[in-house]
Amino acid sequence: GACGYLSCHDYAVHIIEEGADPGKCRVIDEETREKIFKAVGVEGETVYPRLPLVYCAAEWEHKETSAEYKGVQTCRAADLVAGGGMKCEYGCLGLSDCTIVCPFDALHMEKGLPRVDVEKCTGCGKCAEACPRDIIEMQDKKYEKLFYVACSSYDNIMRVREICGVGCIACGVCEKLSQGKLFKVTDNLAKADYSKQKSQKDFANIQPKCPTKVIKDI
């Protein structure tokens, strides 16, 4: 699991017998966590749920191709064969490698993109490990909503509009509105900086101003 141990029992044994950190479980609520801390006689820090962010917003209708891929139907195989025929070399290939490895049935493909069931996700990170293009990243959810730029492309605006249409165009609106604190555009791609966030409104107020609506939330 996300705690780094084989099972809940294995984790519990390490806590009791080896003094392992009792605050690594991300699927229990705060009340249960406090009970565990009290039972083992330690104080712990708040542990936030960890969710996978999919840095791509292109559904099947947005994915421009240069050739039809007929090889082995896995993302890893397709990525090795001319990127599966996709013109965007950064986007989701949509062949379900991430959903297949999820042990909690928390990820499902919908219109060519993996969708996360936040109620089932335990933050184990197996989906991120399975993605050959590294477009899935695990991130702590400290507020009701977690905002992110759903794009991984470093292509310029002309290329993005040509082969996708829903990606980041590096317009800089998010960076300007946040005065460079919450968003930063580097190499044609905007990225969020959660270390500067103080409230949910910080990102929520900027999200609707994005011209391509590529700032998503989960």
Walk through the language-model features, giving the residues of each:
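Minor-groove-contacting beta-hairpin "wing" of winged helix-turn-helix DNA-binding domains
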Residues: P114-V116, A190-D193
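Polybasic, proline/glycine-rich intrinsically disordered low-complexity segments
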Residues: D187, Q197-Q200
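Ferredoxin-type iron-sulfur electron-transfer modules and their immediate structural context
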Residues: G1-L177, S199, A204-I218
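Short, loop-centered acidic/histidine patches that primarily coordinate divalent metals
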Residues: Q179, S195
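Short, solvent-exposed loop/linker segments at beta-strand-coil boundaries, enriched for Pro/Gly
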Residues: L182-F183
